[in-house]
């Protein structure tokens, strides 16, 4: 790792980074194994060659040689029983080399970003682009805005677009050819043709490789916001120079002037709205503004034309809806978000006259999506589709403590993730489902009924393991009661929830 850093540190001022020779280095694949990238498939093959679960540059060289010399007609034949090395086929070839390729490709981008911040001595302005800024945006900004547009960042229409994006950053022809080989190999696989899904979601074996490509793609799509912010507010963003700088980017902007009435400077007034906010979590993004509906339509038109003209992305403009916040709810980060208006009447007395003043206060609400969450529990066999708890036969062979610990951990994870919700009714229902499902699983193991089991051990026996997180924290760190304590405990955002997505991962 230090050798790689020294190499890129010397060459960081040049755009060309020749990373192809690193694919033949042993420590690259040891580093990839350290990150737990497909270790089982790779090291299962190493055992067949007698290398005792160790990476070898000789194996890598053989793989690359066979990738260039292989006959696809022979590989497509089902001869996995005759030769396990060939039997792994494309999985072995692509996964083994692409896992090291992904690690190598991440290093120059991360180092360029770090060196750029050090050279320009930027004050913490880049933290505004951190994913942790989503929570302050929800609490402080969203309730003061009027319109919101939920945008799903489109996937690239052609794989060559991904290669062209990296080509402007890393001008290493062998690495780009290898990347092109990986992408077309995955695209031509039978599993991808059957599923008819995007290449970013087709493979579960090499998530790091496709996650890196997707992040580069999303970063490229978001570059327009960095450019407009830099031109409008003169915010010097160093990451714009190192990561977002592309070949002929300003030429693309000049060509875009034709769409915006041939005068780019005069159209910047549309983007100087200080109340325009953009946030993104994974592939979903929100564009919110305090301006009028017409201004939001201009932003929508601009993004659609920009993505289609310069990135060849079809974003389906008919699916980008502009809604008013006070009468619309939307899903984001597995939450159901909304802004409600609470009306209240205040009587004012002045001398002998009294006035009745109607006030309207906007309140930001975060709700737990009940139906999707119950559907997730039903898929995991904790309840049926109607939310009625059922036993978990797969856990009946475990010990009682393991079963209770398993159910308690699931509820605590759910409670931890949805600690930012305004109302806890759905969490109480989830707690009831898991608690009764745990009791029925234990009763099935002991050949009894759930009622008899709870009567024998008592309800507090399960309550101890299904205790809410706030109650655990209050026992560890007792707090004195205060008028603001009630409002504080209603909604708590934990920063580590960004690492998981409840509705996309199995419980």
UniProtKB/Swiss-Prot annotation:
UniProt KW keywords: Chloroplast, mRNA processing, Plastid, RNA-binding, tRNA processing
A biological process from GO: tRNA processing
Pfam families cross-referenced by the UniProt entry: Intron_maturas2, MatK_N
UniProt-annotated location(s): Plastid, Chloroplast
Gene Ontology terms: cellular component: chloroplast
InterPro entries found in the cross-reference section: Domain_X, Maturase_MatK, Maturase_MatK_N
Role description: Usually encoded in the trnK tRNA gene intron. Probably assists in splicing its own and other chloroplast group II introns.
Family: Belongs to the intron maturase 2 family. MatK subfamily.
Name of this protein: Maturase K
Native species: Annona muricata (Soursop)
Top-level taxonomy: Eukaryota, Viridiplantae, Streptophyta, Embryophyta, Tracheophyta
């Amino acid at each position: 790792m230090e050798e790689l850093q020294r190499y890129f540190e010397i060459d960081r001022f040049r755009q060309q980074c020749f990373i192809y020779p690193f694919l033949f280095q042993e420590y690259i694949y040891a580093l990839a194994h350290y990150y737990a990238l497909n270790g089982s498939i790779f090291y299962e093959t190493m055992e067949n060659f007698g290398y005792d679960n160790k990476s070898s540059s000789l194996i890598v060289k053989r793989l690359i040689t066979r990738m260039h010399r292989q006959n696809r007609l022979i590989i497509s034949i089902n001869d996995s029983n005759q030769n396990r090395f060939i039997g792994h086929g494309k999985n072995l070839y692509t996964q083994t080399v692409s896992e090291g390729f992904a690690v190598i490709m991440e290093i120059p981008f991360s180092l360029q970003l770090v060196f750029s911040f050090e050279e320009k001595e930027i004050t913490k302005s880049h933290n505004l682009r951190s994913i942790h800024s989503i929570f302050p945006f929800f609490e402080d900004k969203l309730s003061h805005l009027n319109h919101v547009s939920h945008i799903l960042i489109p996937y690239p229409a052609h794989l060559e677009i991904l290669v062209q994006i990296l080509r402007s950053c890393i001008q290493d022809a062998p690495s780009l050819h290898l990347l092109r080989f990986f992408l077309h190999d995955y695209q031509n696989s039978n599993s991808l043709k059957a599923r008819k899904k995007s290449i970013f979601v087709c493979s579960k074996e090499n998530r790091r490789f496709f996650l890196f490509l997707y992040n580069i793609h999303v970063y490229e799509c978001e570059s327009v916001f960095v450019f407009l912010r830099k031109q409008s507010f003169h915010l010097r963003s160093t990451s714009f120079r190192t990561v977002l700088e592309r070949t002929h980017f300003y030429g693309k902007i000049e060509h875009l002037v034709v769409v915006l009435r041939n005068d780019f400077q005069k159209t910047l007034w549309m983007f100087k709205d200080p109340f325009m906010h953009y946030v993104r979590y994974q592939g979903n993004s929100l564009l919110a503004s305090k301006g009028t509906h017409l201004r939001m339509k201009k932003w929508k038109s601009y993004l659609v034309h920009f993505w289609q003209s310069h990135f060849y992305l079809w974003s389906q403009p008919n699916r980008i809806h502009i809604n008013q916040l006070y009468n619309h709810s939307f899903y984001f980060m597995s939450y159901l978000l909304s802004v409600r208006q609470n009306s209240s009447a205040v009587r004012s007395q002045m001398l002998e006259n009294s006035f009745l003043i109607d006030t309207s206060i906007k309140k930001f609400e975060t709700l737990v999506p009940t139906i999707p969450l119950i559907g997730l529990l039903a898929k995991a066999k904790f309840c049926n589709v109607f939310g009625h708890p059922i036993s978990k036969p797969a856990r009946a062979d475990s010990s009682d403590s393991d079963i209770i610990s398993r159910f308690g951990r699931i509820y605590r994870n759910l409670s931890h993730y949805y600690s930012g919700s305004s109302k806890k009714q759905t969490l109480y229902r989830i707690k009831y489902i898991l608690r009764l499902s745990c009791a029925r699983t234990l009763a099935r193991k002991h050949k009894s009924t759930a009622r008899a089991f709870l009567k024998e051990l008592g309800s507090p026996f399960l309550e101890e393991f299904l205790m809410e997180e706030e109650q655990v924290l209050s026992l560890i760190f007792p707090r004195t009661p205060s008028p603001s304590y009630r409002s504080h405990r209603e909604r708590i955002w934990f920063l580590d929830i960004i690492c998981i997505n409840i509705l996309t991962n199995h419980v």
